[in-house]
Each structure stands twice: as C-alpha cells, then as structure tokens.
C-alpha cells in the first residue's frame, strides 16, 4: 500500500483541482476591468480578482494580464468581490447581484506598508532579518543552488558550512540541531547528511539560524539550531512552478510546486523526482611506527560510483475555520533507491617499503529508504493581536534497508545486511498571551517519542571472536515544558525563558541480552536582551544552556567496518554533553551597506568526541594493526570566536555579500584504554592526554552582477580553514561555484547554467595520528572527495505567478530586536 501512496497523492491533488474548476449549466457573464497602482497608475500584472457566490459559497475568479486588464467569465449570481495583489492593500467591493456583463473600470490598489516584509516570493537577493533570538536568511533567487538540494542551500548560509561528507556545522561546531518547519522531522531521516541531499533546494523558503535559542525550542544542539522553512503557496487561485535540471556527472531532476487557494481552503503540494550517478574517490597511506621507525605500511586507493533514484511528495490542505483560525494537514512521502559500487586497491609494505601483499576489495551495495510523515496543525489567533494558540501532531515511519556484498579474490564473499526501522511521534502545544502593548507571556509543551530497531547481519563470519552482527532496539522519550516572558521598555527589550526536559532512554542488545537504560531531568534557562541604539543600529545579548544527546549509533557497542583495518564501535557508557552559550551581536545599516557582527563563547562539559586507538588483530592469517574509532566523554571544551557578515548593494546591477568566522576551541581530557600485545599476551593500560588548542576560520564571498542582455552572473567563493585536534590535522579547503541565468518567455521562465566546484578542489586532506600527534604509533594520510565538479542546466517555468524584479520595501534587514517571536 505504501508504494502506491505517491500515485494516490497525485490523484487526490489533480482530482481536487478538476472538481474546483467544473463548469455549471448556469448562464455565464463577462466581468472586465483594469487594476493599477494608485500612486503611478502603473498596471499590476497578476493581480487576483476573487469572486465568492453568496448562495453556493463557490470561489472563482481570475488574474490580470501584463497590461493590468482582466476578463472573467462567471455564472450569474450574487457575489462578494475582492481584488488582491501581493504587498498591496486588498479592496473589497460591495456585494452585488450580477445578471449581465459588467465593466468595473479602473481599480486602484495602494501599497500595504505592514505587509511589505511578509511577501513570500522569489526575490532578487537573500536578505537578513535579525531578531532577539535568531537570524533569518531568505534563500531568495540564489542561482548557485538551482537544481541543488538542502545541503547546497545550507552551505550558502553565513555561519553554516557543509563538509565533503555532508556534515553540517554552525560556527565550526558540528553539534547543530536541524529542524523542518520548527519541528524534528522525518525529512532529516535516519541518516541526516544523506537525507538533506534528497530535499530539493526549490522547496526551501528560508533558513533560520538560531545561535541563542529561546525556551520555545529544543534544548538539543550545543552549536544552536538550523530551522529549514519549506515553501507553501499563498497566492489565491491556481498557481505554481515546474523545475527541470540536467547535468554531468549524470543528473536529472524534475520538480513541481502546485497551489490552489480559495477563501476557505489552500491546497499546496511539492512533487519531485531526482536521479544522480556520480564518482568519488579516497586515498589512504597508513604507516605503523615503533620508537619512531616505520615497521610496515599500507596503501588503500578507493574509487566508487554512487547512484540514486529518489521520489518525494508533500501534499497539504489548509482549511480556514474562521478568519482567525485554521487547520492544516500535511502528508510527506519519500522513497530512495540507491546503489554504491566501489573498488578498493590495497598494497602492503614491510619496513623497507618492499611490497609484501596486494588485494582488491570490491563492494556492491544496494539500498532502499522509505519515509512517510503525517502532520496536523491547529492555529487560533484570538481577537487580541498576538494572542495565539498552536497545537501540532506529527507521526513518521521510516525504513532503511541495505545489502552490501564484499568480494576479495582468494576469500569467501561476505554479505552485510542492515535493516533499520524508526517511528517518531511528536505532540506540541504553544500558547502566547500579550499583556498590554509591549509585554508577552508564553508557555508550552512538547512530547517527542522515538522507537528504533537496527539489525546488522554479516555472513559468513570469518573470525567468530569478532562477529559484528547485532540486533539493537532503541527508545527515547522526551517530555518538555517551557515558559517565557518578554517585555519592551523604550529602546530595551528582553525575553526570559526556562525549559524543563525529562529524557528516558532504553537500549536493548538482543544478541547478548544486555540492557542499558537511563533517565535524566534538566533545566535549561535562556536570556535574550536587545537594545536599539538608533533606527539603524542595534545590539543583542543572548545566553542559553544546551545539551547534546548521544545518538543510537553512538551507544551501539558492536563494530562496523569502513575497511578491514578501520573499525567504528559505539560506547554504551556515553552521557550527554552540557553547554553554556553566550552571544553578543551588533547590527548596523549604513546606506547601501549592512554589517552584522557577533562575539560568542561556549563552555561544554562531558564533551562527546571521537577518538582512535590501536589494536593488533589477525586478518587473513596475519597479525595486523587495526584502528578502532569510538566516541567518549572528554572532560571539557571551551570555544570562543568572532564572526561578521555584510551586504553591499552597490547598484541594482551589482551586489556583494560576505561572511567571516574566526574561532578557537580548547579541549581538555584523558583517554585511558587497555592494549593487548599478541606476542607477549600482556595487557598494558594506555593513558593518552587528548588536550588540544585549535584556531581556525571560515570565509565566504558572493557577488552578483547583471550583464548586458539582462544576463545574471553569480560567483560564490568559500574557504574552510585548517583544523587540528590531538589526533587529527585537516588542511584547508577552497571551492568556487559559478552560475549564469536568463529570464525567458516574458519572465515566466528562467534558464540557469550552474558550475559547482569549478576547480574540482572540494577535497579533504587529513593526517590522523594514533594515539596522538606527539608520540604516534600510526600515521594515516588521507584524501577524500565525495563528488567531483558538477555542471548543470536548470529550467523553471512559473504560471500564475509574478517574478519580482526588486524586493518591495527595500532590504528586510531586521526589526532591531523588537520582536518576541521564538
């Protein structure tokens, strides 16, 4: 049944549209007129005329052409008539009985200053909105992400970077919480980095970067929160867009956004199909040392081809119960079939670098990932402005199945089977009560309940002493209650909050009949203060207590292998990391230039870190060095830094923006483990000091220029600085993206040529030391490239939509910290 769901969703949507447009046998009349801008008498193309029959309650209407004229055929009857246009004040004409053709003449609309900053449309440039507890980056008309995915979008957001494996970091910290529409979501999937690559960029409206979250948000994510807000059609009538992308290496994508809105309902949808097949590679040179002398070495040269077929559908219906309340139901479905073929050429050498052994290890992997999510939202805006109640329910069911066959000449083929299934249930209620003109009280509850099973099977088992097969059950229930109070006193505003979270975790290892259950209850205070020095200058100060919960794969003690000599295993003794975060921000608008700077500091205890240790194991009849990578709780980490972003609109044809982040992290901690020497059969207790200080930086520059013949040119340059830890040194990475776009078909269509990673330089080069850099017994020199340079051509066509040539109301740079919205 679940495999037929995409067809059912599409049938439901198209059937609804057909019924909405069924003609009747009543006599039709013609209604004509012209809609213009009040100040200039300029015609308004795509203005919407809405007709509501007072007897049947049917909604009909039409839109104006490029000269502002409309000509609507409609049955005779009595109608409520309104004329609407985005960011303009709507006009409600008197209810009237229409029995014959009528010309309404010229209808003038005036701009609505209160709604200028609420326009949901693809604008010319990404803009910045600063509030007490978050910054909002509107995706806008960003050519470099056309035909891309959510990872591409996040990598273009200031303060955010995405590494070559798809891991997302905020201000250099990878422990960032990613939400979809303000809630944990199945769209992030069981494997977050991979799932983000399957979410089309065209489906994203904006990204909220929350470095000092208020009490309304989850306490999880020591770096902060990234909230991805999806597009939902808001314009009246039937409208939408179609996007198609082709590229090399093999890429094809087709996506549609369809919307049908009337007075009582809004039906919106996103459908997408994506196929990709791309090469990648890695090279590893591993050397073993004794007293500083090389005793053996190993070279692994790996190439692969990743293949994906992905379909996603998101269909929602918003029903307006009253003018103040609405009910919205959404169904999301995604299915991805993937394949990964890799060849790993292995060469082994002795202490004199004489070749002692060669092998080729081939892995052929197929996967099937399926997710369905149901969401229901009720919103009631009471009569008093800002008085609001929202209730949410969300349920998701995800399944991931993978089968990998490992082949090596001279040995029996090995099959790895992974079956994972997860259900998530979320219940949430938020209540906002204004008290007077500048005061606000808020309270709410969130329940987040996750159940997961993971079954990993290896056949046959070559070494019974190290059988990696395992079956794990994981359950995590979180109950959260919060309250917050906000006030504005002249130029000052503040938002004080307190959140209580109770977490119950149950881990079952079915193969060994082991249980690992634990519970904890913690308080998380938040403070956000704003000061509006002038109309163009503002300051913010934020404090929040955060945590990082260990994920189920970090708690699973059974082993999984990246290769024969590199093994990852979880640690069931992990406990959460707790972080105190402070953030001081400054915003200044100087003519065409906008500057946003901040200084931040974070102190973490029981910091979760991945470490590497060495074991000697028998592999194919030989004693070989094996690297075991596992997570542990280090003592503490202090992280502080400075960042700034800037926008400069030199003219309508030339725009620049950039960001820079400089940070330092200091880690303290001791790692103790047992080392068994197979020659003497003696166990030695090894103690490694993993204390370290690392200074690094990130920089991004973006330029957009309008060339002759109305061709848009955009270039994005980014640099991810080098990083160091007690066991790793990673070199800096420079990359560049380039795009050209041209409006066609009377600006209803857009062609975009995009070159991602122009210089094919997006590679990770790292040195890994075991046990540490001061006294290594192993040094691994690795180069890794997830995907190569990509060239794509995207075409998008909009119907019943207006392409905005310039964002009305100027830059939406912020409210100076006046808002209380969390």
What does each model-found stretch correspond to?
Residues 53-69:
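Short, acidic Ser/Thr/Gly-rich low-complexity loop/linker segments typical of extracellular
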Residues 105-108, 150-151, 192-194, 209, ...:
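N-terminal periplasmic accessory domains that precede
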Residues 36, 40, 48-52, 84-88, ...:
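Short, acidic, small-residue-rich periplasmic hinge/interaction motif at the N-terminus
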Residues 73, 150, 156, 183-211:
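Short acidic/polar hinge/loop motifs at secondary-structure boundaries
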Residues 312-336, 361-510, 532, 593-599, ...:
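Face-selective signature of the C-terminal outer-membrane beta-barrel domain
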Residues 30, 250-278, 293-341, 370-372, ...:
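Transmembrane beta-barrel wall of Gram-negative outer-membrane proteins
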Residues 399, 504-506, 531, 535-581, ...:
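Surface-exposed extracellular loop regions of Gram-negative outer-membrane beta-barrel proteins
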């Amino acid at each position: 049944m679940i495999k037929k769901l995409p067809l059912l969703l599409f049938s439901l949507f198209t059937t609804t549209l057909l019924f909405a447009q069924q003609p009747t046998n009543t006599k039709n009349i013609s209604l004509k007129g012209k809609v213009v801008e009040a100040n200039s008498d300029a015609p308004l193309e795509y203005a919407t005329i809405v007709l509501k029959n007072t007897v049947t309650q049917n909604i009909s209407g039409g839109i104006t052409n490029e000269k502002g004229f409309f000509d609507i055929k409609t049955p005779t009857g009595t109608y409520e008539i309104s004329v609407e246009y985005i960011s303009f004040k709507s006009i409600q004409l008197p209810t009237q009985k229409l029995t014959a053709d009528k010309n309404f003449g010229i209808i003038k609309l005036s701009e609505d200053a209160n709604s200028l900053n609420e326009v949901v449309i693809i604008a010319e440039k990404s803009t910045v909105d600063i509030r007490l507890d978050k910054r909002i980056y509107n995706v806008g008309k960003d050519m470099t992400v056309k035909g891309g995915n959510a990872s591409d979008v996040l990598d273009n957001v200031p303060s955010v970077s995405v590494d070559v494996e798809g891991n997302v970091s905020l201000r250099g910290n990878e422990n960032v919480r990613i939400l979809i529409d303000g809630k944990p979501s199945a769209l992030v999937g069981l494997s977050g980095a991979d799932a983000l690559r399957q979410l089309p960029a065209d489906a994203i409206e904006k990204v909220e970067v929350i470095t000092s979250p208020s009490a309304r948000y989850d306490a999880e994510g020591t770096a902060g929160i990234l909230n991805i807000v999806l597009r939902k059609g808001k314009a009246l009538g039937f409208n939408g867009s179609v996007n198609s992308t082709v590229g090399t290496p093999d890429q094809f994508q087709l996506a549609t956004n369809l919307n049908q809105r009337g007075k009582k309902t809004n039906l919106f949808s996103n459908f997408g199909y994506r196929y990709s097949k791309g090469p990648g590679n890695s090279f590893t040179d591993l050397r073993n040392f004794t007293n500083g002398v090389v005793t053996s070495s190993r070279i692994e040269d790996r190439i692969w081809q990743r293949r994906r077929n992905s379909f996603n559908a998101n269909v929602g219906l918003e029903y307006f119960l009253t003018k103040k309340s609405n009910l919205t139901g959404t169904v999301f479905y995604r299915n991805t079939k993937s394949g990964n073929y890799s060849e790993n050429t292995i060469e082994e050498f002795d202490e004199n670098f004489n070749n002692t052994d060669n092998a080729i290890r081939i892995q052929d992997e197929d996967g099937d990932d399926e997710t369905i999510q149901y969401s229901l939202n009720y919103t009631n805006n009471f009569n008093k402005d800002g008085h609001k109640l929202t209730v949410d329910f969300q349920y998701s069911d995800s399944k991931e199945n993978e089968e990998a066959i490992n082949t090596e000449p001279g040995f029996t083929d090995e099959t790895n089977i992974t079956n994972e299934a997860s259900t998530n249930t979320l219940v949430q209620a938020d209540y906002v009560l204004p008290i007077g003109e500048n005061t606000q009280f808020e309270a709410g509850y969130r329940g987040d309940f996750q159940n997961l099973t993971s079954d990993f099977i290896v056949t046959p088992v070559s070494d019974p002493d190290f059988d990696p097969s395992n079956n794990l059950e994981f359950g995590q229930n979180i109950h959260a209650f919060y309250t917050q109070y906000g006030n504005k006193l002249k130029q000052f505003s503040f938002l004080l909050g307190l959140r209580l979270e109770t977490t119950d975790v149950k881990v079952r290892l079915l193969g060994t009949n082991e249980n690992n259950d634990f519970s904890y209850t913690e308080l998380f205070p938040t403070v956000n203060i704003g000061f509006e020095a002038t109309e163009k200058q503002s300051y913010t100060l934020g404090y929040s207590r955060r945590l990082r919960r260990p994920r189920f794969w970090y708690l699973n003690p059974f082993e999984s292998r990246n290769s024969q000599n590199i093994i990852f295993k979880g640690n069931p003794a992990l406990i959460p990391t707790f972080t105190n975060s402070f953030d001081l921000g400054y915003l200044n608008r100087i003519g065409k230039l906008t500057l946003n700077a901040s200084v931040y500091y974070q102190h973490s205890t029981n910091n979760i870190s991945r470490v590497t240790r060495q074991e000697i194991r028998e592999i194919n009849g030989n004693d070989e060095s094996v690297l075991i990578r596992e997570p542990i709780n280090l003592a503490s980490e202090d992280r502080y830094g400075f960042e700034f972003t800037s926008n400069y609109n030199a003219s309508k044809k030339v725009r620049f923006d950039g960001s820079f982040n400089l940070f330092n992290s200091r880690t303290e901690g001791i790692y103790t483990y047992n080392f068994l020497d197979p020659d003497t059969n003696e166990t030695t207790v090894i103690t490694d000091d993993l204390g370290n200080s690392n200074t690094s930086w990130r920089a991004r520059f973006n330029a957009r220029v309008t060339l002759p013949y109305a061709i848009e040119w955009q270039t994005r340059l980014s640099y991810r600085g080098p990083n160091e830890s007690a066991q790793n040194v990673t070199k800096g990475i420079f990359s560049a993206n380039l795009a050209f776009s041209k409006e066609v078909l009377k600006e209803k269509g857009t062609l975009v040529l995009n070159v991602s990673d122009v210089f094919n330089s997006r590679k990770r080069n790292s040195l890994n030391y075991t046990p540490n850099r001061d006294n290594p017994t192993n040094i691994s020199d690795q180069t890794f490239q997830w995907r190569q340079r990509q060239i794509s051509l995207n075409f998008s066509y909009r119907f019943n939509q207006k392409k905005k040539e310039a964002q009305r109301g100027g830059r939406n740079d912020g409210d100076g910290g006046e808002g209380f919205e969390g």
